Amino acid sequence: MAVQQNRKTPSKRGMRRSHDSLSKPTLSTEQNTGETHRRHHISADGYYRGRKVTRGQDD
């Protein structure tokens, strides 16, 4: 098993963890219905960029 030679400083630990944060999902509002959905995904009622592309949950 590998054992570290010297202890890492809090600064180096923070530098390593600097890319570990999570980003919030980007949201869009549908033009016709005003419903909020994830970007580049269809909304729950089946609309994408103002067009009906599939049957939604309510249909």
UniProtKB/Swiss-Prot annotation:
GO biological process, one term: translation
GO cellular component, one term: large ribosomal subunit
Domain of life: Bacteria
Stretches for region Disordered: 1-59
Alphabetized InterPro entries for the sequence: Ribosomal_bL32, Ribosomal_bL32_bact, Ribosomal_zn-bd
Keyword rRNA-binding in record: no
Pfam family, one: Ribosomal_L32p
Family to which this protein belongs: Belongs to the bacterial ribosomal protein bL32 family.
Protein name, per record: Large ribosomal subunit protein bL32
Organism name: Halorhodospira halophila (strain DSM 244 / SL1)
Gene transcribed to yield this protein: rpmF
